[in-house]
C-alpha cells in the first residue's frame, strides 16, 4: 500500500515493532506476536485477540502515532473477522489518548486479513481509498469518528 502513495501524499513513517530486525523507516514492518501486550500498546489491538492472528504488520506516523497508525492482521480463521473487528473498535473507542487525539477509525476486512487504521481524518481517508483501489474486495466493517 505505502508504495502506491504519491510522494506528495506520504508523511514521515515507520513500521514494525520493538525488535530491531522488524523496524523499518519509510515502510511497513513486521509486528511480532510473542508479546500480546506489545501488540496492544503499539497498535491498539486487544491482547485477547492476538491468539486469533498469525501475522501482523504496522505503519505509523514517525512524529505521533495518533496522527496515523495502521495495523494489518492475518486471521487464523476468517470467520473471526466480525468479532475481532468489533473488539478493535471497542478498544480504540474507549482508549484514553495522550499526545493528540485521533480523528477517525476505520476497520476493514480484506480476504483473511483485518486492517485497522486510525488518526488524522485526511490521512485515514487517503489510506482507505488506496486500500479499496488496490484490493477491490475490501469491506469496510466500521468507519467512525473517535469521540
Residue spans for each PLM region:
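Soluble, non-membrane globular domain cores that form compact, hydrophobic packing
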Residues: 1-69, 75-147
Amino acid at each position: 500500500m505505502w508504495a502506491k502513495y504519491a510522494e506528495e501524499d506520504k508523511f514521515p513513517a515507520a513500521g514494525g515493532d520493538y525488535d530491531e530486525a522488524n523496524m523499518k523507516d519509510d515502510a511497513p514492518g513486521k509486528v511480532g506476536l510473542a508479546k500480546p501486550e506489545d501488540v496492544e500498546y503499539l497498535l491498539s489491538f486487544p491482547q485477547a485477540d492476538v491468539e486469533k492472528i498469525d501475522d501482523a504488520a504496522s505503519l505509523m506516523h514517525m512524529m505521533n502515532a495518533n496522527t496515523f497508525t495502521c495495523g494489518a492482521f492475518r486471521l487464523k480463521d476468517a470467520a473471526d473477522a466480525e468479532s475481532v473487528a468489533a473488539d478493535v473498535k471497542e478498544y480504540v473507542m474507549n482508549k484514553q489518548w495522550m499526545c493528540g487525539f485521533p480523528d477517525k477509525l476505520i476497520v476493514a476486512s480484506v480476504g483473511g486479513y483485518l486492517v485497522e487504521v486510525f488518526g488524522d481524518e485526511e490521512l485515514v481517508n487517503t489510506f482507505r481509498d488506496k486500500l479499496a483501489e488496490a484490493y477491490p474486495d475490501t469491506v469496510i466493517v466500521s468507519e467512525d469518528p473517535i469521540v
